[in-house]
Amino acid sequence: MDAALQSLSRFVADCAVLAPKVVNGRFGKMDVLHHRPTTSKLFLRKTIAAHSFSADEINVHDLMSDHPSFVDMYFCYSSPTAWAIVMDYVPCPDLFETLQTQGALDNALVVNIVRQLCDALNDLHNATGYIHNDVKLENVLYFGARDRVYLCDYGLCKREHSPVHDGTLEYFSPEKIRRHNYARSFDWYAVGVLAYKLLTGGRHPFERSADEVLDLASMRRRQQYNDPAALKNVRNLMARDFVFCLTRFNFECRSTDYKQIAKHSFLASRHDYI
């Protein structure tokens, strides 16, 4: 047995699964592992059926391994029916869970989170040529004690210009709905939707009521707005304009470039957060 297999074998033998932490998702099962020799060290293991596995997920882990906003991977192994990825366990809630407990976040915290998220996406785009393709509340963690945003779950990442169409409908840009090839603009549009949700406690910019489930037809129709007043649930005018700039229907008028987005007055202005 070579050194890598020996290391993996020892690691698996030394870990205990914390059953209460198990989470089952559409593209895999996740459970938390307690590494007994180190007493307190926890790892997250994602198990993916072989037919749902994408090597791009491993590539992104490898390519972004030194980035503070990406989750470190320690092992990846497979059987004939499944793959498993063992990575750092980040002990904090995702943004969906945060909104469930805290409601709408204050502007300063939203700016802090969105700035870090934009930086992480820009680094992913420029360093690897990958599009995350599933930016949403559930895939972004904010660890308040570290003041650190983590962008996670790389299972739907694809190279720019790939002709694949996956993700979460309520974050789809008009071009993604029209089944254009992967583009960086997909991620930036999703950031606009995510920012709106943070500012409103989980509401979607195009829903008519808090309990409405948006379908494809509703998204197609309501994306064609051209007045920031439609985003009236966001009271701060700079914040409202930021969301508007990232979610405008007309691609030529929309903010789709990191430098342009980072200079927006909402992100560039000073806020008393820390």
Curated annotation (Swiss-Prot):
Its EC number is 2.7.11.1. It is an enzyme of class 2 (transferase). GO terms for molecular function: ATP binding; protein serine kinase activity; protein serine/threonine kinase activity. Coiled coil: none annotated. The lineage of its organism: Viruses, Viruses incertae sedis, Naldaviricetes, Lefavirales, Baculoviridae. It catalyses: L-seryl-[protein] + ATP = O-phospho-L-seryl-[protein] + ADP + H(+); L-threonyl-[protein] + ATP = O-phospho-L-threonyl-[protein] + ADP + H(+). Keywords: ATP-binding, Kinase, Nucleotide-binding, Serine/threonine-protein kinase, Transferase. Residues 16-273 form the Protein kinase domain. The active site is at residue 134. ATP binds at residues 22-30, 46. Belongs to the protein kinase superfamily. Ser/Thr protein kinase family. SMART domains: S_TKc. It comes from the Viruses. This is Serine/threonine-protein kinase 1. It holds the Pfam family Pkinase.
